[in-house]
Amino acid sequence: MVGAAPACPGDAGTMRCAAAALVAIASIASIGAAFAAPPLGSHQHGVVQLDIAVDANRISVQMSSPLDNLLGFERAPRNEAERGRVAAMLATLRDTLFVVDPAGACRAGAVQLSSAALKLGEPDPAEQQSGHADLDASFEFDCSSAARAGFIDTSLFERFAGIQRIDVQLATSRGQRKLTLTRPAQRIVLPR
């Protein structure tokens, strides 16, 4: 009979059957992984990854993007015009890219930026060896009641023409979920 489980007589047979079952499960899992979506933080032009965590008194936004999305190139700047573009990008990232629903009573906190190509923060050895250049950013919001916040608005599409899609992973006390924003959307709705 096709698809029927093999008979496992006796103790020795049970161990062999258990081992065979584990091999089968591992094979199925590896096939599924091969067709899964790219891991968060993977380098894909036009796409920004956001991880958002909502705690009782804090909202954290972790962003990862290829530099090309933000600058139009993926390397250290080579001339004065490119250095000017980098300075403008950094100022924009330190500005108000994310606005939290006033119901959460949040105020913007620290912004941390990291990019090996731009010599910002801690260099990522994997990025240096890959030939691709990314920018990772961390945005913190201190809140009186983060759980009351119903949304976060972002101006990423408005400020950076190279961004075509934003993949978001949310983690709150009400659970986790994924969503995707495309132009002209700017609101990330938080689970309530």
Regions picked out by a protein language model, each given a short descriptive name:
Residues 37-192:
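N-terminal soluble domains immediately following signal/targeting peptides that reside
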Residues 31-36:
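Sec/Tat signal peptide C-region and signal peptidase I cleavage site
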Residues 19-30:
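Bacterial N-terminal signal peptides
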Residues 3-6:
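Intrinsic, low-complexity polybasic segments
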